[in-house]
Design a protein with these regions (language model features):
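Bacterial N-terminal signal peptides that target proteins for export
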Residues: 1-13
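Sec/Tat signal peptide C-region and signal peptidase I cleavage site
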Residues: 20-26
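Hydrophobic small-molecule pocket/channel-lining residues, especially in calycin-type beta-barrels
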Residues: 27-162
Length: 162
């Protein structure tokens, strides 16, 4: 009986040790071909208002995303996040905002954004040659910081890899 308990304990410990790395891998979302620095091409994009003078996204190989935007009126905004598979994560630099990124394929990611309890779904595509990334914002309304009234919101941003 002691031998069976020892074998069972050894088997359980072995399974836990083998499963632990799988849990870590399942949470990571490496960027693959999405990694790099991307700059918006305003001429090919559609913004809800005046186009920003700079819209740059940097995606690290580990999947971390950093966004740098300079609005048409010169205001700078920086925000970032590191997506985790199956998990909504907080966005640094955007209060009360989270995002869950769902990998649909190597060429498409869906995003579920939550801002102050309101949910918005968007998606991004990557061209087969890996040189163009397109972000498709969900139609709806958006209240810009400092504004009291929401405005219609629709956005398609074409980013080119640098």
């Amino acid at each position: 009986m002691k031998v069976n308990l020892m074998k069972s304990g050894f088997l359980a410990a072995s399974l836990l040790l083998c499963a632990a790395p799988l849990t870590v891998v399942a949470q990571d979302m490496p960027a693959g071909a999405w990694a790099g620095t991307w700059v918006a091409n305003s001429a090919k994009s559609k913004f809800p208002g005046p186009a920003p003078t700079m819209d740059q996204v940097t995606i690290e190989p580990d999947g971390s995303v950093a966004v740098h935007v300079v609005s048409a009126d010169g205001k700078t905004t920086d925000w970032s996040y590191k997506p985790q598979a199956g998990k909504s994560v907080s966005i640094q630099g955007r209060d009360n905002t989270t995002v869950e990124v769902v990998k649909v394929s190597d060429y498409r990611n869906n995003q579920i954004w939550t801002h102050e309890g309101k949910i918005t779904q968007t998606h991004s595509t990557l061209s087969k040659d890996g040189k163009v990334q397109t972000f498709y914002g969900a139609p709806g309304t958006y209240r810009a910081p400092g504004e009291t009234k929401a405005k219609p919101f629709s956005e398609v941003v074409v980013y080119e890899k640098q």
